[in-house]
């Protein structure tokens, strides 16, 4: 149990050496911890911070009540070589972070190339950035500069001030079978059309986005900033608006006046083979996201998982 901590609760730091180097920092497990009230002296502290390490497992932790990011894994900016790879950030319960103190944060944050890294089974909610900064950067899952070769699957992110999922720029990421819902600006955002999508090997694919449930309420954007067809591979996602039904909006740039309806986005080739239907959550308005067995999302290929697996192992902490 970590409670009322001045800075990081858990801090892992190695050097950016070759993965075969005998001094590489690797094979560490951070699991089944309760982490709360971190960063009480250094407000920008992180609950679990991993720098230059591989094969680290961060799982079954409950992390809450911090002023900045809960889990952060990097640390190379852009597409340069990074020893950080094959990390597992799984089945964590993360909530009530940011709290309006700082900006540019995520429940889970990654930086740089990370082949083999998986973000899975996490529940993230109530991430709030500093309103004096325009609420900038209250993200659920935040893949920052150069984040690449990362799989994001079976996560539930909701009630985030900015976006449930945010990709600054990166390549060859897979985002599948997640629930991104009821967040402030949009549910999913990529900034890939800033001209920094292409790594040195000439690749152009920023992201595969499929089999996700994307739920808005009252016209907030489902997806934003997706004008780069070459980098954007979206298909077979489930879209719905809690208040407006099939009246769903997509932003094709950073400006609100570039918002278009989902039907027009389909014509432009930005949205492919969607299921536009109520996913039939048990009570989404009250944040109960259990799916009805007759859900059209399941019929469309979405695979439910047990949300109760997130957080510390019951009865042990």
Task: Give the ranges of each region predicted by the language model.
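Amphipathic alpha-helical surface "interface" segments used
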Residues: 51, 56, 313-317
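Generic hydrophobic alpha-helical scaffold/packing signal
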Residues: 109, 139, 153-156, 166, ...
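Acidic, glycine- and Ser/Thr-rich low-complexity intrinsically disordered tracts
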Residues: 197-317
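Asp-box/WD-like beta-propeller blade repeats and closely related beta-sheet repeat scaffolds
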Residues: 15-17
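Short glycine/acidic-rich loop motifs that flank beta-strands on beta-rich extracellular proteins
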Residues: 6-12, 39-46, 67-73, 82, ...
